[in-house]
C-alpha cells in the first residue's frame, strides 16, 4: 500500500507527491487483487485517498479476510462449501475451530443474548449498532488467545510430542451480521469501520428498510429500492477501501418473502409492485379508508376487517398479469393473441434480463392493444406509505443482478429449504454473474422434518447446493439452540439426580470425546500465564496456578498412557479416556 507518515510534509510539493504516490499505489492494489477483479466502483482511487488520514494503520482482520477469500474460492472451484454456524461465545468458537473453516456471528443471537445495553429482544436490529462488532471482537480475541496458548504449549513440547499432538487452526475467519447497515450511508460506513477494527473478515448487509427491519423468517418485511441497497454496498466497499482492507462483502436479499417496499422510485422494482384493479375504488385509497374507520372509533379486529374487505375488493395484481389478462380478452384471433402475448413476454420477461419501468411497460401494452387498463399502485399503499410487493425468486434474481458488481457473495433468504428455489436462483444470478459466489442460510427457523426430505436428503443438502455455487453455508442460530438444548436437558437431570447427572452427562462425555474443556484451567490459559509469570521472574514462580496442589492433576495423563475411569452405571462398566 501507499506511503503513510505521521510527519507533516515539509512543503506543498511534498504533500502533493505523497498524495499522488498513494493514489497510484491504491489503484495498483485494486488492479492486482483477485478479489477486486469483478468489482465495480462508482468512485476513483483519488476519491478514496482524499478520504484517508495520513497515518497508515494495519488490521489483523485484513489477513483474516484474505484467508476467507482463499477458503471460499477453493470451495467454489471444488464445488464444495464452507459450512459453519452462529457462535455464541469463546467456548463455542474454540470448539468449532477443530472442525470448521469459518465462523458466523448472528445479529439474532446478539439481539437475544448479548446486546451492549444488556437488554435482550427479538431480531429487529433495534439494539446499539456496536452490538455485533463487539461480539466479533469478543470471539476474535478468544481466537487469538487460544492460538497464543497453543503456540506456547507446542513450543514447550519435544518434536516427537508435537508430532503426536494435532495442530488446531484457531484463526478461522469470521463473517458477521451487518443487518441493514443501521441507517444511511454514514451509519453504514461507521458500522463497517467497527467491523474491520474488531476482527471481521466479512460482513453481510440486507436489503430491508432499517426502520422496519425484521428477522428474515418473520412477517412484515419491507424492502428498500434496489438502488438504495446498491448504495449501501458502495458505502461499505468505500469504507473498506479507505481502510485499505479486503473485507468480503455479502449482499443479502429478502425479496423472496417480502410483501412491502418503501418506494416505487426504482424501475427495477416496478414489475413486482402490486396495484388495485377494481375501478370502483378509484379515489378511495386504503389509507384514507382506514383513517376514516379509526376516526369513527374502530380498532383492533374491526379495523382489520375493514382492511381485509378493501383488499378483497381491490383484487391486487402485478401490472404484467393485468396486461396478460387483457390480451387474452381481446376480440382478436387466437393466433394474434399468441403473437401479442409472445411479444409482451419477450420484452418484459425476467429471464431475458429486460427490466422495463411501469411507464415503459404501459406504453408497450398500449401498442399491443391494451389501452383502457385500470391499475393503480398507490391505492393499496399502507398507512405508513409502503407499496405492496409480490416477493418471488425472480425478484431476488433481479436484485442479485444489481448487487453482483458491488458484492463478493450473494445470499437469497428463503422461507424453506427448497432445492428448486436454490437452483433457479443460482442459475438466474449466474446467467449475468457466472463467477459470483453464493451463500445459503440453513435456517433453524425451517421445520426441516416438515420439508418432506428423507434423512439421506438432509445429509446431502449441503453438498447438493454447493454444486450449484453455494460455497458458504451456515446455520445462523445453531450455537443458540445447542446451548439451550444442553442446558435444558442437563438442568432437568441435575435437579433429579444431582452429581451423577453431571458426571454421567458432562464429565464422562468430555473424557470420552476428548473435549479439552475437561481440563478447564488449562483450557482457560492457566499454563500460559504461569509461563508468562516465570518469564517475568527469571524462570520460577512460587504462585504458579498449575503447580502442585491444583485439582486438575486428577485428570492428568501422560503421552504414553491414558487415564481410565471405571464407574458402575447400573450393571455396566464404562472406560473413559481423558485427552488433555
UniProtKB/Swiss-Prot annotation:
Binding-site list for substrate: 106-108, 216-217, 252, 441-445, 476
Ion transport found in the keyword field: no
Compartments, as annotated in UniProt: Glyoxysome
Cofactor section: Mg(2+)
Active site: 215 (proton acceptor)
Database matches in PROSITE patterns: ISOCITRATE_LYASE
Assigned EC number: 4.1.3.1
Pathway: Carbohydrate metabolism; glyoxylate cycle; (S)-malate from isocitrate: step 1/2
InterPro entries given in the database record: ICL/PEPM, Isocitrate_lyase, Isocitrate_lyase_ph_CS, Pyrv/PenolPyrv_kinase-like_dom, Pyrv_kinase-like_dom_sf
Top-level enzyme category: lyase
Recorded GO CC terms: glyoxysome
Keywords: Glyoxylate bypass, Glyoxysome, Lyase, Magnesium, Metal-binding, Peroxisome, Tricarboxylic acid cycle
Enzymatic reactions: D-threo-isocitrate = glyoxylate + succinate
Microbody targeting signal (motif): residue ranges: 578-580
Functional description taken from the UniProt entry: Involved in storage lipid mobilization during the growth of higher plant seedling.
Subunit structure: Homotetramer.
Protein name from the UniProt record: Isocitrate lyase
Species of provenance: Pinus taeda
